[in-house]
């Protein structure tokens, strides 16, 4: 009888790969996001928004999830959303936060101004540049490409 080693992790990853959603934007703990979830009421469905700060990202693969915290009527409310859930309709990043921790559970004890998170201006600028490139690519001919091509033509003419 021959012993055959089976890599269960590789098999599990290959099965999970089909169920992983890739359409979420990149966000990190400290970012303020709006998560729209599908809610079924009777025979109709609607989207319900939950807006707050991402305080943790847990897991990998299809088991990956993120925790969002908000203050509602003076009470802290936290919800855990699976990345690959079909009930999560859309995730929108509203603000980029600058933090030094991966888990922001300390925010649970802070109140008011102490619970604020600084804005990460460098990531905001990178997002704006990336959005501009996407818009230019969608238009087909970007203004920066036309400017560089006209500058190249001017230097060749001299």
From Swiss-Prot:
Keyword Ribosomal protein annotated: yes
Sequence ranges of Low complexity compositional bias: 130-139
Ribonucleoprotein among keywords: yes
Pfam entry (one): Ribosomal_L19
GO molecular function: structural constituent of ribosome
Transmembrane spans: none
InterPro entries linked: Ribosomal_bL19 (IPR001857), Ribosomal_bL19_CS (IPR018257), Ribosomal_bL19_sf (IPR038657), Translation_prot_SH3-like_sf (IPR008991)
Region (Disordered): 119-158
Ranges of Basic and acidic residues composition bias in the record: 119-129
GO cellular component: cytosolic large ribosomal subunit
Entry keywords, A to Z: Ribonucleoprotein, Ribosomal protein
GO biological process: translation
Biased composition (Polar residues): 140-158
Family according to the record: Belongs to the bacterial ribosomal protein bL19 family.
Job description of the protein: This protein is located at the 30S-50S ribosomal subunit interface and may play a role in the structure and function of the aminoacyl-tRNA binding site.
Protein name in UniProt: Large ribosomal subunit protein bL19
Taxonomic path: Bacteria, Thermotogati, Deinococcota, Deinococci, Deinococcales
């Amino acid at each position: 009888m021959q012993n055959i080693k089976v890599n269960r992790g590789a098999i599990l990853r290959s099965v999970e790969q089909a169920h992983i959603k890739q359409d979420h934007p990149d966000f990190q703990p400290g970012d303020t996001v709006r998560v729209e979830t599908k809610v079924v009421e009777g025979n109709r469905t609607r989207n319900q928004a939950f807006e707050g700060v991402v305080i943790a990202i847990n897991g990998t693969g299809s088991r990956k999830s993120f925790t969002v915290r908000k203050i509602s009527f003076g009470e802290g409310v936290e919800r855990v959303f699976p990345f690959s859930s079909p009930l999560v309709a859309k995730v929108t990043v509203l603000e980029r936060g600058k933090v030094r921790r991966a888990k922001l559970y300390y925010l649970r004890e802070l109140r008011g101004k102490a619970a604020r998170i600084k804005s990460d201006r460098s990531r905001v600028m990178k997002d704006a540049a990336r959005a501009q490139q996407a818009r230019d690519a969608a238009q087909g001919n970007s203004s920066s490409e036309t400017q560089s091509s006209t500058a190249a033509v001017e230097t060749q003419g001299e």
